């Protein structure tokens, strides 16, 4: 459909090779994906929905195409919350852009990276300041429930605010967690938390025999008392 006369209307740019390209004044050249752009002009020769990548980050500029670049004029390699935007720590989640300097305004409410300088964390669904990746920095062990514990485990309910999480023997808020795992043996008393021998006497201040269960209460607390 394109003539070989280079001076004619819409001359064939590839007169010796069959092709159907019709964009960028490059007519009649091979166009593998049929999007109108010659393979030599097309940054995505097997994807008919994308053809140009202005910032050379691997994501196409067409917002309606496959994997569209969210920041078409700024090179970036984010791939999780949006494609092709700056991702300082390289975890796949783009840096927040509250002013829209690189593209549309984008905040943590849009799933931007809450920790743009920490490759191990990116989101905090329960807003308790501990990241949801349990294997990452200060990982939240109860990502679905806000909590302030930080001694035995991070981000779980701590009723008395002493830093030790409440026991969770059925795993309602996270993994099963008992006093044996480090949970608070006294979840309603901020001054006590450990009872290694399970005798009901606090190890840190009261139990004179913290590693041996006992019921003594007179001369000393929490030690064996043979006659009761």
Q: Residue spans of the language-model regions?
A:
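Extracellular calcium-associated, cysteine-rich motifs in secreted modular proteins
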Residues: 1-228
């Amino acid at each position: 459909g394109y003539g070989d006369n280079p001076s004619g209307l819409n001359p064939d740019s590839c007169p010796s090779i069959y092709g159907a390209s019709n964009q960028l004044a490059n007519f009649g050249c091979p166009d593998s994906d049929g999007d109108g752009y010659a393979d030599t002009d097309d940054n995505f020769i097997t994807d008919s929905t994308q053809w140009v990548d202005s910032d050379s980050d691997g994501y196409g500029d067409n917002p309606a195409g496959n994997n569209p670049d969210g920041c078409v004029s700024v090179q970036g390699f984010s791939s999780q919350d949006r494609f092709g935007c700056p991702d300082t720590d390289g975890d796949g989640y783009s840096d927040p852009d509250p002013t829209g300097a690189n593209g549309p305004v984008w905040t943590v409410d849009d799933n931007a990276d809450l920790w743009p300088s920490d490759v191990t964390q990116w989101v905090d669904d329960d807003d308790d300041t501990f990241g949801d990746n349990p294997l990452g920095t200060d990982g939240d062990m109860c990502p679905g429930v806000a909590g302030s514990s930080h001694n035995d485990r991070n981000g779980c309910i701590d009723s008395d605010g002493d830093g030790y999480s409440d026991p969770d023997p059925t795993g309602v808020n996270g993994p099963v967690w008992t006093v044996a795992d480090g949970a608070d043996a006294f979840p309603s008393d901020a001054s006590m938390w450990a009872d290694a021998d399970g005798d009901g006497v606090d190890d840190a201040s009261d139990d004179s025999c913290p590693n041996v269960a006992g019921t003594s209460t007179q001369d000393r607390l929490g030690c064996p008392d043979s006659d009761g």
